[in-house]
């Protein structure tokens, strides 16, 4: 039971993490960031990600991996809200730093938690293979949700102006798509919330006392 609850929670919250990462390029472009700036932003996340990941690991020794993963989930929920209100490049750079603070830590400690919850340690290689597949398949729901919400919002904005995709000019469509983008990003919080409910609400109830100390 703990393993099943954890896998479903992980699938949800890590989907949100991967979606925010994959959508960052289009969001930065909408704010006027060129390809060189985007490359620099991605590099910044990687450079800052390593020391913050090590910090997560160090704090996990004191507070436990479960607590630190929970902290990372909360950080990414805040990132969704912050991204929704973001409208300038300096805020985008702040967003990159925020992502860097938790990206490596939440991924590394999620894997560590999975290893500690394994009921059969002898089959750890096989189980970690399945875990990696879960991680790679987890970026499916998020992009789909972002696309649906963005399209719905854009169509609503067009209708409010008495327009359709067929009657609007290319400039109008581009402007409305850019305006609808933040709503798509905000929708990612729904997936992370599902993971958070399972992680904070369901998982502790099915864990043993020893497992709660992880």
Task: Describe these PLM feature segments.
Residues 19-38:
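Short amphipathic helix-loop junctions that connect adjacent transmembrane helices
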Residues 35-36, 120-131, 181:
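Loop-to-transmembrane helix entry/capping segments in MFS-fold secondary transporters
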Residues 51-65, 150:
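Helix-to-loop junctions at the C-terminal end of transmembrane segments
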Residues 67-82:
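Structural signature of the two symmetry-related core transmembrane helices
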Residues 84-96:
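Helix-loop junctions at membrane interfaces in 12-TM secondary transporters
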Residues 105-119:
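Intracellular juxtamembrane helix-capping segments at the cytosolic ends
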Residues 150-192:
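A membrane-interface helix-boundary motif in multi-pass transporters
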Residues 183-214:
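Multi-pass alpha-helical transporter architecture, strongest
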């Amino acid at each position: 039971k703990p393993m099943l609850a954890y896998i479903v929670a992980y699938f949800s919250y890590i989907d949100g993490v991967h979606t925010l990462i994959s959508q960052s390029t289009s969001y930065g472009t909408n704010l006027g960031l060129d390809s060189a700036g985007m490359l620099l932003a991605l590099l910044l996340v990687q450079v800052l990600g390593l020391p913050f990941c090590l910090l997560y690991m160090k704090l996990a020794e004191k507070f436990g991996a479960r607590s630190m993963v929970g902290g990372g989930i909360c950080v990414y929920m805040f990132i969704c809200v912050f991204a929704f209100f973001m409208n300038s490049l300096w805020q985008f750079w702040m967003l990159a730093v925020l992502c860097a603070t938790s990206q490596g830590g939440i991924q590394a400690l999620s894997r560590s938690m999975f290893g500690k919850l394994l009921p059969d340690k002898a089959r750890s290689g096989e189980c970690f293979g399945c875990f990696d597949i879960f991680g790679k398949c987890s970026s499916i729901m998020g992009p789909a949700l972002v696309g649906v919400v963005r399209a719905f919002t854009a169509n609503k904005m067009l209708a409010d102006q008495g327009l359709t995709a067929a009657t609007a000019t290319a400039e109008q469509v581009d402007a409305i798509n850019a305006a609808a983008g933040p709503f798509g990003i905000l929708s990612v919080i729904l997936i992370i919330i599902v993971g958070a409910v399972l992680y904070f609400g369901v998982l502790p109830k099915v864990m043993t006392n020893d497992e709660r100390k992880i």
